[in-house]
Amino acid sequence: MKITLICEKEARTSAVLGVVGALIFLFAFPKGSISTLVHEVLGLPGPGAGIGLVLGPFLIVVAVVSSLLSRGSGGALIASLMFAVVYALIVHLFKIPTNQKGVFGSSLFIAAVIVFSVVSEAAMALGKRLSMVWRCMLCGAVANVVLLVIYWTVIFPRTTGWIRWSDAPVLIGLCFACGLASGCIAWGISRPLSKALAIK
């Protein structure tokens, strides 16, 4: 399968989307707000509800929109990487407190987002036979579940503990559904955005 990389203009657009996404996420979800939303308001078990219902879907919108605004591959990777790096830089430079359970802004956080972005790129590439909206939804669902599994197996055991097996099916189902919805939302956002930016 031949892989065509994005051009310089598309790379800059993806980088800007990643930076804007990081700024929005940083100020929309200050310390403790995600845990409060998913556990106290929605009453969901954890750990992982915040990843599957908030962080993952937000990243999916950033990554998939960037991918759709690019003719070649690499948009999702650049946008996701910029999201993670800029988020980490702002948190460390301005000493902004974050929830240590999710290690937001740490090297583990950046590594998890990089894996997420690689999975997103692969899902978008492998789903080319599907219609565009289903391709985006497939990407969102797969990437969101992968991000959640990374947190369950690598990050949460270090910070808060292992997920209970009885809670895993519910969270995976919600994670998958939110990934599908986020992919669809990203597809919808990209259509007017691509016309406004005159990229395609």
Report each predicted region and the residues it spans.
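Short helix-perturbing small/polar motifs within transmembrane alpha-helices
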Residues: 2, 9-23, 108-152, 187
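Hydrophobic transmembrane alpha-helices
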Residues: 2-69, 74
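Membrane-helix interfacial "entry" motifs
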Residues: 2-13, 48, 52, 68, ...
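Interfacial aromatic-anchored transmembrane helix boundaries in multi-pass membrane proteins
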Residues: 32-33, 44-48, 84-119
